[in-house]
From Swiss-Prot:
Keyword Cell inner membrane tagged: no
GO cellular component: ribonucleoprotein complex; ribosome
Gene Ontology MF terms: structural constituent of ribosome
Database matches in HAMAP family: Ribosomal_bL28
Annotated region described as Disordered, given as residue ranges: 1-31
Organism: Paenarthrobacter aurescens (strain TC1)
Taxonomic placement: Bacteria, Bacillati, Actinomycetota, Actinomycetes, Micrococcales
Family: Belongs to the bacterial ribosomal protein bL28 family.
Pfam families for this protein: Ribosomal_L28 (PF00830)
Protein name (database record): Large ribosomal subunit protein bL28
Length: 78
């Protein structure tokens, strides 16, 4: 599963783990990605989305129809 949110566009960040002695090791900071299934009344079907935690909250506030319309407008196939 790709670490990419379909709503917010959140992607992994890169940086360093820093030990107590301040040695640095490269690492990757992954977003909190979840697969979530929603019923979309306008499409009359279920849609499975790959979402970050913030993307799930966005759907709670704006509604699934509005968010799916934006995703489809970007040309992403659902």
């Amino acid at each position: 599963m790709a670490a990419h949110c379909q709503v917010t566009g959140a992607e992994p960040g890169f940086g360093h783990s820093i030990s107590h002695s301040h040695r640095r090791n490269k690492r990757r900071f992954d977003p909190n990605i979840q697969k979530k299934r929603y019923w979309v009344p306008s499409l009359r079907r279920n849609v499975t989305l790959t979402l970050s935690a913030r993307g799930i909250k966005t759907i709670d506030v704006r509604g699934i129809d509005s968010v799916v319309a934006d995703i489809l407008a970007r040309g992403v196939k659902l």
